[in-house]
Amino acid sequence: MITELHGIDIRENEPLKHYTYTKVGGPADFLAFPRNHYELSRIVAYANKENMPWLVLGNASNLIVRDGGIRGFVIMFDKLNAVHLNGYTLEAEAGANLIETTKIAKFHSLTGFEFACGIPGSIGGAVFMNAGAYGGEISHIFLSAKVLTPSGEIKTISARDMAFGYRHSAIQETGDIVISAKFALKPGNYDTISQEMNRLNHLRQLKQPLEFPSCGSVFKRPPGHFAGQLIMEANLKGHRIGGVEVSEKHAGFMINVADGTAKDYEDLIAYVIETVENHSGVRLEPEVRIIGENL
């Protein structure tokens, strides 16, 4: 127990595999769940004072945590999940579930968020990655974000300063952490919005292996190609290392089928990259983030 952080939900030596979508990941020295910005600021101030590393995991959906875990503080925003509407502007805290946020927009007949109706993860992670699907992406509706800088300062970043690109934002370089974000939506028809979300979710269920733990889409889309198609053409569907395999349903996904480890994921990713490059000449670039220490 860290006495200076009394009252904050902090768990010591906590296995992160219980919190990741892949169901892999070693322990965090300290796993913290702040309830508000004040608690978050206290954690960061303490970590900086003690020269302890800290990072925010978000929803840990498009992420692999290595088997040795993470030193210092890991901060999860599960309890920072409020969503507010002000006219056609939706503001969500970083820990708000992305799928649930799209449902709130639908309930109020606001359009613009439909593309994200089946994307797992949090608002903070979606902004960080400029998450997208089916022709839409976060940058299309993003207004601004409040962020926490590595030094512990809170500031606001505009859409222009975020410099969005394909699965990219400026904060991937700066180390700033989203704590809330605002999005510009438009008035729409509830039934039309609902039908579009149902259509997109049906497509996702048909094409993606949602029944298994996974990190979502593993690779970025290479220019002029589709990663899944290249992997399939290299005869890698179903290829397995340890407990992790290339999905038979969608080759762009790697699923944890038998108590796989982060090392299994990393080894399979490396094997797929090498095999696809040898087969097609295209070098795939991972979309998934890999963090932490090896065993």
Swiss-Prot record:
Protein's UniProt keywords contain Zinc: no
Broad enzyme group: oxidoreductase
Catalytic activity: UDP-N-acetyl-alpha-D-muramate + NADP(+) = UDP-N-acetyl-3-O-(1-carboxyvinyl)-alpha-D-glucosamine + NADPH + H(+)
Source organism superkingdom: Bacteria
Matches recorded under PROSITE patterns: FAD_PCMH
Keyword terms of this UniProt record: Cell cycle, Cell division, Cell shape, Cell wall biogenesis/degradation, Cytoplasm, FAD, Flavoprotein, NADP, Oxidoreductase, Peptidoglycan synthesis
Entry EC number(s): 1.3.1.98
SUPFAM superfamilies: FAD-binding/transporter-associated domain-like (SSF56176), Uridine diphospho-N-Acetylenolpyruvylglucosamine reductase, MurB, C-terminal domain (SSF56194)
Keyword Oxidoreductase appears in the UniProt entry: yes
UniProt subcellular location: Cytoplasm
GO molecular-function terms, A-Z: FAD binding; UDP-N-acetylmuramate dehydrogenase activity
FAD-binding PCMH-type domain segment(s): 23-188
Gene3D superfamilies: 3.30.465.10, UDP-N-acetylenolpyruvoylglucosamine reductase, C-terminal domain, Uridine Diphospho-n-acetylenolpyruvylglucosamine Reductase, domain 2
Any single Gene Ontology cellular-component annotation: cytosol
Cofactor(s) required, per the database record: FAD
Pathway(s) this gene product operates in, as recorded in its UniProt entry: Cell wall biogenesis; peptidoglycan biosynthesis
Active-site residues annotated for this sequence: 167, 217, 287
Record-level GO BP terms: cell division; cell wall organization; peptidoglycan biosynthetic process; regulation of cell shape
Primary role: Cell wall formation.
Family: Belongs to the MurB family.
Listed name of the protein: UDP-N-acetylenolpyruvoylglucosamine reductase
Source species of the chain: Streptococcus pyogenes serotype M18 (strain MGAS8232)
Gene symbol of the encoding locus: murB
